[in-house]
């Protein structure tokens, strides 16, 4: 149920080390106006819908099924929110949940830990966030990384994200770091919109005065210019937690960008971390997306173990879940990492994973 795609021995060692352990799950929430560009993301059918995707996802993640949610899960072109996968797993396995608000326009309807960040402007501005905000988020992320490590004790921490438009800010950071990511990233679209993403990213890097062919020497300025608030929080959190416990960065393109950022923070700012304790965990739909090259991207970054759950919805009786097999949605809210955990912690197989998700989805569509 788990396949390791890169740095196989390190990835297998990590899996063996944490087999049978119950982790804790932290989901880092953020917003970027980049996600409102028409057509940039399918995480919400319209830009108006995408303003509230994160709020709806975390309300569902925390409260579960409700007759009248304040923020209902948004309509999608096809598929169903990945939060359904995450929720089914963390509830069934009783995995502790921490929600971190790194920067949202609207106050969440459920309890979150406010990190004192801010939502990001569109990356085309070349000034997505103030440098002081990035510096603060790195510090507070590191603080909470240490706290989560203490809570996890001998186990590991899953760090997921909820940022609409986040694969585009990820591409911007990757190119700014000098990583050959063109044509390799993923999106929530069935066919990745590489040309649109690249045009947006080039505009932002040019506005900020960064040359995408040269690795940046000041990573915090890069994230402030073209990034989003989640990235720097997870980087600080993951690096700090890795000094004591295992860390799974639960996501695809976005978490590979965070890992690349960690490497540069360690090199340029001498931040301490233990990279042997960190893996990136995602879904098969991301790792094997024929319209991107996730494995190639991980190899470009270097030294990062990339693994994915082999969960599939081929045999699902719900067309919304079957849509994942046609390339829709793919990942989000840490669903891939949580599916990996279901097998690692309780040895769940395909049948058990599918049943947990379908049981929740059946109740969800009954209430709709």
UniProtKB/Swiss-Prot annotation:
Gene3D superfamilies recorded: 3.40.50.10210
MF GO annotations: nicotinate-nucleotide-dimethylbenzimidazole phosphoribosyltransferase activity
SUPFAM superfamilies tied to this protein: Nicotinate mononucleotide:5,6-dimethylbenzimidazole phosphoribosyltransferase (CobT)
Source species, domain of life: Bacteria
InterPro entries assigned: Nict_dMeBzImd_PRibTrfase (IPR003200), Nict_dMeBzImd_PRibTrfase_arc (IPR002805), Nict_dMeBzImd_PRibTrfase_sf (IPR036087)
Covalent S-S links between cysteines: none
Family: Belongs to the UPF0284 family.
HAMAP family with a match to the protein in the record: UPF0284
This protein's name: UPF0284 protein Tery_1555
Species for this entry: Trichodesmium erythraeum (strain IMS101)
């Amino acid at each position: 149920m788990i396949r390791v795609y890169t740095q196989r021995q390190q990835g297998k060692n990590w899996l063996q080390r944490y087999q049978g352990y119950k982790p804790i799950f932290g989901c880092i929430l953020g917003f970027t106006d980049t996600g409102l560009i028409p057509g940039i993301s399918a995480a919400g059918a319209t830009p108006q819908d995408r303003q509230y995707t994160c709020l709806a996802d975390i309300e569902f993640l925390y409260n579960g099924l409700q007759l009248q949610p304040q923020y209902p899960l948004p309509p999608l072109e096809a598929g169903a929110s990945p939060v359904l996968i995450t929720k089914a797993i963390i509830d069934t396995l009783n995995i502790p949940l921490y929600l971190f608000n790194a920067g949202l326009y609207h106050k969440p309807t459920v309890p979150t830990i406010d990190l004192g960040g801010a939502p990001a402007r569109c990356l085309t501005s070349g000034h997505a966030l103030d440098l002081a905000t990035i510096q603060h988020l790195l510090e507070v992320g590191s603080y909470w990384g240490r706290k989560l490590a203490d809570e996890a004790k001998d186990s590991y921490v899953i760090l997921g994200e909820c940022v609409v438009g986040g694969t585009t800010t990820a591409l911007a950071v990757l190119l700014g770091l000098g990583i050959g990511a063109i044509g390799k990233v993923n999106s929530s679209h069935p066919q990745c919109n590489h040309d649109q993403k690249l045009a947006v990213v080039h505009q932002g890097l040019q506005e900020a005065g960064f040359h995408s062919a040269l690795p940046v020497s000041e990573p915090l300025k890069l994230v402030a210019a073209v990034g989003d608030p989640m990235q720097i929080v997870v980087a600080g959190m993951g690096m700090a937690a890795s000094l004591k416990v295992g860390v799974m960065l639960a996501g695809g393109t976005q978490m590979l960008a965070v890992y690349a950022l960690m490497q540069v923070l360690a090199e340029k700012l001498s931040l301490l971390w233990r990279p042997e304790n960190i893996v990136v965990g995602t879904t098969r739909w991301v790792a094997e997306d024929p319209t991107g090259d996730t494995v190639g991207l991980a190899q470009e970054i270097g030294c990062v173990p990339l693994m994915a759950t082999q969960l599939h919805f081929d045999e699902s009786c719900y067309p919304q879940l079957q849509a994942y097999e046609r390339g829709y949605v793919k990942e989000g809210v840490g669903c891939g990492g949580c599916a990996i955990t279901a097998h690692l912690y309780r040895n769940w197989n395909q049948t058990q994973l599918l049943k947990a998700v379908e049981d929740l989805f059946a109740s969800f569509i009954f209430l709709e």
